């Protein structure tokens, strides 16, 4: 998007700025830049300090723990792609202490076949939805039930496949990241049966919320206007 728009903005000789919403730290760097542009540096720094304090406390939860290997599937209607650490969802998992099995790239998303995914052997598979979450969750359920290769993944065998709440795990950074990190905590670092049960309950609730979103119906209504 930036590569397309930047030459146009430069051509009309106007003030412009692009926000980095691919990660939480990127969002706060953008906030600092906006504070400088609009002479609101104190307010911007206050937000940055709040994030720094929050994240310093959050990191202490998982100090010294082994980082689980995680694969993130970003679902689209009819297909899915791999989310890398350069995407917002990937950055959240990284902030939470997960090790993304597709980290050796500068791309946000990758198209990869399941055979290659199997070679990565993730401990955990996370499923997120971008656009029409009601369709995406049904697609994931169907594919994992009917595509035999999934049954050979350790994450599937061990019951460590989780759906993520679509409002928290989208394409762009938002101030809902604390809720996202809280959701990831029992998924990535279950320390008790209670944590494991909470992770499954959260995943089930994410599925239900996606199914109840009526996103497809709302989209079709908009298209018909």
Task: Give the residues covered by each predicted segment.
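Acidic/His-rich segments in extracytoplasmic proteins that coordinate ligands and/or metal ions
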Residues: 1-37, 112-152, 186
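Histidine- and/or cysteine-centered catalytic micro-motif in compact active-site loops
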Residues: 75-77, 85, 105-106, 122, ...
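Extracytoplasmic substrate-binding proteins
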Residues: 5-78, 99-102, 157-222
């Amino acid at each position: 998007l930036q590569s397309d728009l930047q030459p146009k903005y430069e051509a009309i000789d106007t003030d412009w700025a692009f926000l980095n919403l691919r990660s939480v730290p990127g969002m706060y760097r953008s906030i600092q830049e906006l504070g400088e542009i609009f002479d609101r540096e104190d307010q911007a720094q206050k937000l940055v300090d709040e994030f720094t304090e929050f994240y310093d406390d959050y990191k202490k939860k998982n100090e010294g723990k082994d980082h689980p290997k995680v694969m993130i599937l970003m679902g689209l209607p009819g297909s899915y792609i791999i989310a890398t650490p350069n995407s917002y969802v990937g950055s959240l998992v990284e902030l939470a202490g997960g090790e993304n099995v597709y980290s050796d790239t500068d791309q946000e998303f990758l198209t990869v076949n399941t055979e290659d995914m199997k070679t990565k052997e993730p401990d955990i598979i996370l499923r997120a939805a971008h656009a029409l979450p009601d369709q995406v969750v049904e697609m994931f359920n169907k594919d994992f039930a009917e595509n035999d290769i999934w049954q050979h993944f350790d994450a599937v065998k061990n019951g460590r496949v989780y759906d993520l709440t679509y409002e928290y795990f989208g394409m762009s950074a938002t101030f809902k990241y604390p809720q996202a990190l809280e959701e990831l905590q029992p998924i990535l670092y279950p320390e008790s049966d209670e944590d494991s049960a909470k992770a499954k309950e959260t995943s089930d609730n994410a599925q239900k919320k996606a199914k109840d979103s009526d996103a497809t119906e709302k989209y079709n209504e908009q298209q018909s206007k």
